[in-house]
Amino acid sequence: MPSPMKAGGTAIAVVALGLALAGCGSDTKSAPSSSASSSNSSKSSSAKSSSAAPSTPAQAGKNETIADYIKESGITETPVKRGEPGTPTLDLPIPAGWEDAGAKTPDYAWGAIVSTDPTMAADPPSIVALMSKLTGDVDPAKILEYAPGELKNLPGFEGGDGNTSTLGGFDAYQIGGSYVKDGAKRMIAQKTVVIPSKGDVFVLQLNADGLEDQMGPLMDATSQIDEKTTITP
């Protein structure tokens, strides 16, 4: 998620990354971050859609999130692991030049991939997938409404409001931008997908994260994921 942003600054990079995660605008129509992911998206950079126009830095902690909605609505959230019985089947492609994160996958994640480029080995770009099962009076529209809040609350976040989209035929919301971690600016894009299944609602979140000069590999990878991912509820 390198060079494109040099042509027009971070603003262009943010938009480009978001569009890549959105499938370059294809399959876009009128997702989430769970309460677990809202505390973990900025932690996933080492293992580890979009904005229409850049905005000024967001004020940390000022935007309502999916985690807030879950808590306020008395909804029960259960983290989902890959292959767990009774959960949606997610087939995420692994692009060339990337590999499964394996033991480096965060404990809270459904799965993760990282770049294998040796020039980025010190801090490789990553894409982390999280999934949660929501039980209770869940309004899918509210999940999408509050999806942008998590990224907007990251330290020094700069980006747009994001936009609606789809992934694997399911409604989603994507947002992208930059934020500051350990004094360095990083690029991040997030796609939140709502998957109704067997009377429950599952929420899938994809977090693509990397340094500013890793924009290119991230764009290529997220584009393939958007085009080739299949979801079976």
Predicted regions, residues:
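N-terminal export and membrane-targeting signals
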Residues: M1-V14
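N-terminal low-complexity, Pro/Thr/Ser-rich intrinsically disordered segments
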Residues: S44-E84
